[in-house]
């Protein structure tokens, strides 16, 4: 099992490293999908910040101008994991996230990267009867060795997610410590327009993990994954002390009611252009 694991990890790293050699100059010309809801690029005040590549309507890569890339990997047409390649002038920095189905409604998510390839951070995603992510548990930090998997540190938190069963959009996320004390609660509000990634195919169990992993982000490259039906307009957070803060997003739309420009009250005058 160990040999297979390390073989898989190294094979993935070498593969995406090879891809990176051909990707660094891809941003010179944005390749438009021509499909509303499948973004081709994000621009910050007119400057390219990320470009997107697809296989059909399945997202396959997010490329940054510096060469850093996030690769969405598939096996037999099914999403299987994420690989990261570093900026073009950086040798270290390859990483990976593997998704393994462990039960009818559970997935194990294992993530790690260089330089400590034998160390994994592991979470479990549990789905409800509608196939929507309901709970994400950080189970701990593990080291893979000759004797299998050894736990180095116990997980210390979990999150409960609430989705609208009709729109399948995230409405609430509550993060607790392992004694079930509430650490922070997030609530989410949306517009009524078509979502900026609404024609992009991504599994809900990936999206649930993504929302948990990037809950503190306001970078649109990560936040846009909330826009699978409509578009996020407000995220409110409340911590265990009762302190409340919020982030708001506004948009300009094209003739088909898809967002083409995004604004955030935390971006200090920056506007993000969305190209399809």
Language model feature labels by segment:
Residues 2-11:
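Bacterial N-terminal signal peptides that target proteins for export
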Residues 26-276:
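Buried hydrophobic residues that stabilize the cores of well-folded domains
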């Amino acid at each position: 099992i160990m040999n297979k694991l390390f073989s898989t990890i190294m094979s993935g790293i070498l593969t995406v490293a090879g891809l990176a050699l051909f990707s660094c100059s891809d941003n010179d010309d944005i390749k438009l999908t021509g499909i509303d809801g499948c973004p081709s690029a994000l621009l910050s005040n007119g400057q390219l910040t990320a470009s997107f590549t697809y296989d059909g309507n399945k997202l396959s890569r997010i490329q940054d101008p510096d060469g850093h890339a996030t690769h969405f990997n598939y096996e037999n047409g099914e999403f299987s994991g994420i690989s990261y390649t570093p900026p073009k002038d950086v040798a270290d920095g390859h990483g990976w996230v593997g998704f393994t189905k462990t039960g009818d409604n559970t997935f194990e998510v294992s993530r790690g990267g260089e330089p400590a390839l034998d160390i994994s951070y592991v979470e479990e995603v549990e789905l409800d009867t509608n196939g929507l992510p309901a709970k994400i548990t950080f189970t701990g930090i593990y080291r893979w060795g000759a004797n299998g998997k050894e736990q180095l540190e116990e997980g210390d938190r979990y999150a409960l997610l609430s989705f609208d069963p009709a729109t399948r959009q995230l409405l609430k996320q509550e993060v607790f410590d392992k004694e079930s004390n509430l650490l922070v609660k997030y609530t989410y509000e949306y517009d009524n327009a078509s979502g900026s990634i609404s024609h992009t195919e991504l599994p809900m169990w990936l999206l649930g993990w993504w929302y948990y992993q990037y809950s503190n982000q306001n970078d649109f490259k990560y936040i846009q994954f909330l826009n699978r039906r409509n578009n996020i307009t407000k995220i409110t957070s409340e911590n265990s002390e009762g302190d409340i803060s919020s982030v708001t997003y506004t948009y300009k739309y094209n003739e088909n009611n898809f967002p083409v420009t995004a604004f955030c009250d935390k971006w200090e005058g920056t506007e993000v252009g969305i190209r399809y």
